[in-house]
Each structure stands twice: as structure tokens, then as C-alpha cells.
Design a protein with these regions (language model features):
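Glycine-rich phosphate-binding P-loop
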Residues: 42-64
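Switch II of P-loop NTPase G domains
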Residues: 77-81, 88-145
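Canonical P-loop GTPase G-domain recognition
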Residues: 164-267, 276-277
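A charged amphipathic helix-loop-strand protein-protein interaction module that recurs
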Residues: 262-263, 293-348
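Short hydrophobic alpha-helical segments used for membrane anchoring or interfacial signaling
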Residues: 278-284
């Protein structure tokens, strides 16, 4: 009887298992690398020299008072800082000097270095600039470079120093500037589409990820060019009021990982304690990370109350620092409670290592639930 070679099924199974394990390990390594990139976001802060970029950065992240920013000098080339936010998110913040020579360098020799792997572009316009056409021409070149190298980046435009415009005409001036910037943005996108016609068409939906589309997707060189003039966000800002906190809270909101989980848990907490409203602040900057409002609280007529609270708490923190002699970046308080008879009750307390929470209770509710 002839002998036949039997296939070595044990060896084949072992080889398949080893290959599967290798593939799994590679996938996990890639996922970890992706998550690491998500948690370290490259943020470009750009605009003409003197537009107020470094001032707003110092107020938000370095606890400067508005009046203290007068002693800040002009930014030379790129001022790179790593801002830790909520513990696990690092903002790789590139504060780019706005002098003409630097701008030309960013758009030529350093083009790929500056505009690659960008998560967010924050562009600042000085509303009182005397050379608007030149400012817009530079902006068009910046947007073209961004779309070329990081076409999935989010764009935020801040129309700054709005306090210098008369209150009666402020809204009209802002609306006209917004329309102009959107039109110029469309022109910049059209330039790149003309150069790369193969990348025209609507953008596909980004892959799901923690914290929304921004946190779950990274720029792809082959993705279609988006309609930035539609998706971009524009804000009127000033260092002298709460408008700066509104703009920067919106920027941070798009960068926070697991934001949907935070919002869900905050809503559950609000319902459980029968609150009117809850705000979650980042500990150092006091930017609003997330918020929840009850159906009754939605009737509050003050739409800017969230950024107002950021501004008030930051000012109170500065006051505590002044009278206690502690550094501005130090933790100035753990909690406080405020009551107005039976009509209003609110408390602010340290919530986690990196956050504070503000809770407003409905009229008549006892506010003794604030931690002691």
C-alpha cells in the first residue's frame, strides 16, 4: 500500500495563528499611533503682525490680564508651545509671527513644514487694519496652502478688536467682513481645485471617532477638497470682554476626545440632581468644555451667559491670586456657593483633576448638595 504525504495541519494552523497575531498587533499599534496623533493636535494661530494673536493666547492659556498684554512684544518667526488641556489632550500651538517676511517664508521654504498635519487653523483679522486688501490676499494664500497639505483641518476666523467699533454699527461691520472672508475663502479653495481637479467633489463623511468627526479623522492627501467657506466658523472678538472665551471654547470643543461621552454623563448628572444648568470648565483656562441645560433652563434669555461665566470666574481667580499672593496658574479655590434667597442657588466646585463644575439649581431647591 502506497504511502502518501499527509499535510501538516498543525504547522499550518500555527502559522495562520502567528500571522493573525502579527496582524492584530500591527493594527493595535496603528490604532495607538492614531490615538496619539488625535490627542496631540497641531493648531496654527496666524494673522498679520499686531492683530492680537499672542495677546489672546496669553489671556486664555497663560492667565494674563487684558491690560498686561500691552507689554508683549512681536512674535519672531514661530513661537511653539505645548498646551495641556484636560490632562490627555495636548495642543501643539504654533503662534506664527505675522510680519511680511515671515509670512512669505511660511508660504515658500517652510510651506510643507508649517501646513502639514494641521488639525485647526485659527486666523485673526484686525478689524481696524488699513490695508484690508493686502490682508485678504495673504489670507487666500494661507488657505490655499492649508487645503493643499491639510484639507481636513477645521478653520476658525476671529475678527478681532471689535471693541474699537461703535456698538451701533458693530453687527453690520462684522456681517460685512464675514461675507468678504467667506468669498475669499471660496476663491482660495477654487485655486487648489483648479490645480488638482482630481480632488473635486463632495467630501466623504469622516470616520467615526471619539469626540466627533474632528477627533476621529486625520488629514488624507487623497480626500476631496471641502467647501471651507461653508464649514468654517467666524467670531467677533475682543480681549476686553467675554467674546474671546466664546470663540476659544468653540475651538476647543472640536478637539476634545470622547466629548460625546462627557456630554452624555453630564446630562445624566443634571437629571439626577434636578439641576437647571451645568457647565464643565477646564481648570486652568476656564473655557467651557461641555454644558447641559434642562428644558426649563432653555428659557434663559441670556445666550452669552456661558462665556460670561468663564470671564467672571477667570477674573475672580485673578483677584484671589492678587490678595493671597499665590501664582496665577495655581489652584485658587476648591469650591464656593452663592444664594439669593429662595430664587437662585449656584455652586462651583472642583470636579476632577482638570475640571471645575458649575451647577445652577431651580428656584426653591436646597443648595446644600455642594461638596463641603
Amino acid at each position: 500500500m502506497a504511502d502518501y504525504d499527509q499535510p501538516n495541519t498543525g504547522a499550518s494552523t500555527a502559522a495562520a495563528a502567528a500571522a493573525a497575531a502579527t496582524a492584530t498587533a500591527a493594527a493595535q499599534a496603528a490604532a495607538q499611533a492614531q490615538l496619539k496623533k488625535v490627542k496631540k493636535q497641531k493648531v496654527l494661530l496666524m494673522g498679520k503682525s499686531g492683530s492680537g494673536k499672542s495677546s489672546m493666547r496669553s489671556i486664555i492659556f497663560s492667565n494674563y490680564l487684558a491690560r498686561d498684554t500691552r507689554r508683549l512684544g512681536a512674535t519672531i518667526d514661530i513661537d511653539l508651545s505645548h498646551v495641556k488641556f484636560l490632562g490627555n489632550l495636548t495642543l501643539n500651538l504654533w503662534d506664527c509671527g505675522g510680519q511680511e517676511a515671515f509670512m512669505e517664508n511660511y508660504l515658500s521654504q517652510q510651506r510643507a513644514h508649517v501646513f502639514s498635519n494641521v488639525g485647526v487653523l485659527i486666523y485673526v483679522f484686525d478689524i481696524e487694519s488699513r490695508d484690508v486688501d493686502r490682508d485678504l490676499a495673504t489670507y487666500v494664500n494661507i488657505i490655499s496652502a492649508l487645503v493643499q497639505y491639510s484639507r481636513e483641518a477645521k478653520v476658525f476666523v476671529l475678527i478681532h478688536k471689535m471693541d474699537l467699533i461703535q456698538p451701533m454699527t458693530r453687527e453690520d461691520v462684522f456681517d460685512r467682513r464675514v461675507a468678504l472672508v467667506r468669498r475669499k475663502t471660496a476663491e482660495a479653495v477654487a485655486i487648489v481645485r483648479k490645480q488638482k481637479p482630481e480632488l473635486t467633489g463632495p467630501s466623504p463623511p469622516p470616520p467615526p471617532g471619539p469626540g466627533g468627526a474632528m477627533a476621529g479623522s486625520l488629514p488624507s492627501p487623497d480626500s476631496p477638497i471641502p467647501d471651507l467657506e461653508v464649514s468654517m466658523q467666524l467670531f467677533a472678538t475682543s480681549i476686553w470682554d467675554q467674546s474671546l472665551y466664546k470663540a476659544w471654547a468653540s475651538i476647543i470643543h472640536d478637539l476634545v476626545p470622547n466629548l460625546s461621552v462627557i456630554e452624555t454623563q453630564l446630562a445624566s448628572l443634571g437629571v439626577a440632581i434636578d439641576a437647571d444648568e451645568i457647565l464643565l470648565f477646564e481648570r486652568t483656562s476656564f473655557l467651557v468644555v461641555s454644558k447641559w441645560t434642562s428644558p426649563e433652563g432653555e428659557s434663559n434669555p441670556y445666550g452669552d451667559r456661558f462665556e460670561r461665566m468663564s470671564n467672571i470666574l477667570k477674573a475672580w481667580k485673578h483677584t484671589c491670586s492678587k490678595f493671597t499672593g499665590t501664582p496665577r496658574n495655581a489652584e485658587q479655590f476648591s469650591d464656593f456657593e452663592y444664594k439669593m434667597g429662595a430664587n437662585f442657588s449656584m455652586f462651583v466646585t472642583k470636579f476632577t483633576t482638570n475640571t471645575y463644575i458649575l451647577v445652577c439649581m431651580p428656584p426653591g431647591e436646597a443648595s446644600s448638595i455642594a461638596p463641603s
